[in-house]
Structure formats: C-alpha cells, structure tokens
C-alpha cells in the first residue's frame, strides 16, 4: 500500500515536468522553425 501512495504522489509531479518539457520544446522548435509543424502541400 505504501508503494501505491508513493506512486500517486510522484506521478502527477513527473507528468507535470514531462508535459512542461514537451510544451517548452515545441514552443522553442516553433520559434526557430515557424512552419515546421505545418505539413508541406503536395
């Protein structure tokens, strides 16, 4: 039971850090390459 409580207290922190890192990288990539997220028209 202690492991479950530890997981439930650590998981939101790890998820927040991961999504913060992901969003930050996407913003920085989009800043340097503004059209990289748009698929080129064929």
Swiss-Prot record:
GO CC, any one term: photosystem I
Membrane topology: Single-pass membrane protein
Pfam family, one: PSI_PsaJ
UniProt cross-references to InterPro entries, sorted A to Z: PSI_PsaJ (IPR002615), PSI_PsaJ_sf (IPR036062)
Signal sequence coordinates: none
Purpose of the protein: May help in the organization of the PsaE and PsaF subunits.
Protein name: Photosystem I reaction center subunit IX
UniProt organism field: Aneura mirabilis
């Amino acid at each position: 039971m202690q492991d479950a409580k530890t997981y439930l207290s650590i998981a939101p922190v790890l998820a927040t850090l991961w999504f913060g890192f992901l969003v930050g990288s996407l913003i920085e990539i989009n800043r340097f390459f503004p059209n990289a997220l748009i698929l080129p028209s064929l």
